[in-house]
């Protein structure tokens, strides 16, 4: 069983990352309104998570603590599936369908390009 101190360190890393991620999302959404703001943070967050995913699998440049702080904390608070869902639910059918399609396609594309970007920088294969 992990010691309470080590668990608290993890909680603090996630909390610090989450604080920074939430502030960054707020700042972006203050300047990019509505669905485009949420789409922007979700796509950017997916791109960053794709980079972390590739790094964790092949490179280990970012250690476990960095992945907790940045992946779980920062990106977890930076992106927002719930706001995307509420926005989509409150729209008429066709605009909602477009919003859902754009979010799914672009966030998956973001993960792909994040992985590809780190792969190109590291010259390793996926």
UniProtKB/Swiss-Prot annotation:
Which GO CC terms are listed, alphabetically? plasma membrane
Q: Does the keyword Ion transport apply?
A: yes
Q: How is its activity regulated?
A: Na(+) is not transported, but it plays an essential structural role and its presence is essential for fluoride channel function.
One GO biological process term is: cellular detoxification of fluoride
Q: Name one Pfam family in it.
A: CRCB
The record describes its membrane topology as: Multi-pass membrane protein
Membrane-crossing segments per the record: 11-31, 36-56, 69-89, 93-113
Specify which residues bind Na(+) according to the UniProt entry for this protein: 76, 79
Keywords per UniProt: Cell membrane, Ion channel, Ion transport, Membrane, Metal-binding, Sodium, Transmembrane, Transmembrane helix, Transport
DNA damage keyword on record: no
* Reactions catalysed according to its record: fluoride(in) = fluoride(out)
List, in alphabetical order, the Gene Ontology terms for molecular function in this entry: fluoride channel activity; metal ion binding
According to the UniProt record, which cysteines are disulfide-bonded?
none
Q: Where in the cell is it found?
A: Cell membrane
Q: What family classification does the UniProt entry report for this protein? A: Belongs to the fluoride channel Fluc/FEX (TC 1.A.43) family.
Q: What does this protein do?
A: Fluoride-specific ion channel. Important for reducing fluoride concentration in the cell, thus reducing its toxicity.
- Name used for this protein in its record: Fluoride-specific ion channel FluC 2
Gene from which this protein is expressed = fluC2
């Amino acid at each position: 069983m992990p010691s309470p101190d080590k668990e608290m360190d993890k909680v603090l890393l996630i909390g610090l990352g989450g604080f920074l991620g939430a502030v960054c999302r707020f700042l972006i959404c203050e300047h990019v309104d509505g669905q485009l703001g949420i789409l922007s943070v979700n796509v950017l967050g997916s791109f960053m998570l794709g980079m972390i995913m590739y790094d964790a699998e092949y490179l280990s440049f970012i250690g476990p603590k960095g992945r907790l702080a940045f992946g779980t904390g920062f990106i977890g608070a930076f992106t927002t599936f719930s706001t995307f869902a509420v926005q989509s639910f409150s729209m008429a059918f066709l605009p909602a369908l477009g919003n859902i399609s754009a979010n799914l396609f672009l966030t998956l594309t973001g993960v792909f390009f994040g992985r590809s970007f780190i792969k190109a920088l590291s010259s390793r294969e996926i």
